[in-house]
């Protein structure tokens, strides 16, 4: 059976997952030769997001067809939007890296064709809130609060139960004034995995 090597970054909203991923891919793509996993979603693009780069933006019918046809490795619903990772988003020749939520991690854990390495990015609530409020010109405060509430439930179960079942697990703190320390820790972890 063919196995896909997947490095999954996971963390609450505003923890810095995407920023760390961008730094690793842009600064060290040649060093690690990583394949970035681009997920699918049915939501509208946010300011600055590009189809095929940030996400594959598809309508709900296309997404439903992909689920029905067994092309999705994992998927989940947030509000009325669907998010997921398709099998065709993975490379068999390179180590794959992407951002996942706790439900996605659980789905990947249960797949025999995935060799999973989880890196949990954490930050204080204050730091996360500051990042989310300053990320966009006109942030949707209600959406930020909704994501905070959802994270409390999702990550409680993840922290209490899922982490114990992971074979390959690393926690990295990306708090106040520690971005480059977190990046350094991430690179050291990647050196061991890749």
What is the meaning of each model-derived region?
Residues 9:
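Hydrophobic anchor at the beta1->P-loop junction of P-loop NTPases
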Residues 18:
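Walker A/P-loop
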Residues 12:
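P-loop (Walker A) phosphate-binding loop of NTP-binding proteins
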Residues 97-101, 111-133:
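Conserved phosphate-donor/acceptor-positioning beta-strand/loop module used by diverse small-molecule
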Residues 31-45:
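Short beta-strand-centered segment that lines the nucleotide-binding/catalytic pocket of NTP-utilizing
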Residues 15:
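ATP-binding Walker
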